[in-house]
Amino acid sequence: MRKTKIICTLGPATDRDGILEQCIESGMNVARLNFSHGSHEEQQKRIDKLYELRKKYQKPIAALLDTKGPEIRLGDFNDGKVNLKQGQKFSLVTNEVLGDETKAYVTYKQLPEDVEPGTRILMDDGLVEMIVEAVDETQIDCVVVGDCELKNHKGVNVPGLHLNMPYMSEKDKSDIIFGINNHVDFIAASFVRTVKDIEDIRAFLHENGGDGIHIIAKIENREGVENIDGIIAASDGIMVARGDMGVELPEEEVPILQKMIIGKVYEAGKQVITATQMLDSMMKNPRPTRAEVADVANAIYDGTSAIMLSGETAAGKYPVESVQTMVRIANRPEAGIDYEKRFYHRGRHEKPDVTEAVCHATCTTAYDLNASAIVAVTKSGRTARMISRYRPACPVLGGTTSKRVWRQMAMSWGVCPILLDEKTDVFALFDHAVDKGKCSGLLKSGDLAVITSGVPIGISGTTNMLKVVNVE
């Protein structure tokens, strides 16, 4: 069983007949809906198709809504894109106009107030660079550095600039309510800078009936990196969003920051996603570069919970092949990792709570007895996530009666989510979970399984029980 989870971004490429279904068959665990692009109508069609296929395959494919966030983007171009030459003049304007070879609309109205002659402005994840020459109230005149192509809605970055805008825009609020109404499982919060950004989203979710939705904080700028410990504590998981991070910060810092952030989130027992340009060449080519293969493998060696495909599946020529390639790459390093050695080298927390202590003991018991699987029966998913935190070698069956938790566990490293029927007796629930494990093919008669849960059942945060069973 593959332990690292795969997130696929939906878009025009997966809208084609049969493509999303093939991605699911190939190993997709989570569907990402990028609300920086596409209308609610377009996203609704994707969600409806996803939910139809989820029901058909009875698979817990989670839905992740990625917000636009407090970012700056270009508007539309007359022909969808323009080609620019080194040294030519180009203007960014705050009046909403169709772009051409001389100008483009920029969504941040206050940008002229925040830049000055000599300021570097980067676009499209740093592929396009311009230098500011002159500024007035509504227009920034620039000179283009290097031949380049600009397309609709590409991101705009000014390294080191603090955006003087509220964290949650009206668009983000509208998108999040759309997600609540469509029962998404995760919100990926773009450009998180401080703990307050997470608190604002959580309060908004609470006010609008979205309490069960988990928040993944995207770390994309220096402020987010500087506040990483608090952001990890406040959120349910972290996305290492390397595209904007590599523009906002020196690119040579990105690998170091990636390892640091993955390590911190891993230690906190939360989910961590490594994202952006993982198989970027497969946008146009059927095979990845060797450097991309090494990049994906190194993220897995670092301990990432999930690896994400962005443009590769949303708009690339080879979306299905990209998923299949991710699966093959993930399987190889996983097969070579000594998880038991890592577990004992890692040790345990000095002051664990009851759940952490029981989960650590569960993993120790599984290693000592060479168990075939760990069965974590959980109300909120926390028990399964705590087991996942210790990266056990054997599969983790995350059993829950909640459909949302069932789907959310699809992002947890090493966890195979199983949906359980409601039971009033704890031992009947354990037997039911083991039977489901047999149906999944991860358990068979004669296997040894270690079960952990909480008594009384059905109450979140009460993990206090460990049981070893011989599967009949």
Give the residues covered by each predicted segment.
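Non-catalytic helical/linker scaffolds that mediate oligomerization, partner binding
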Residues: 1-472
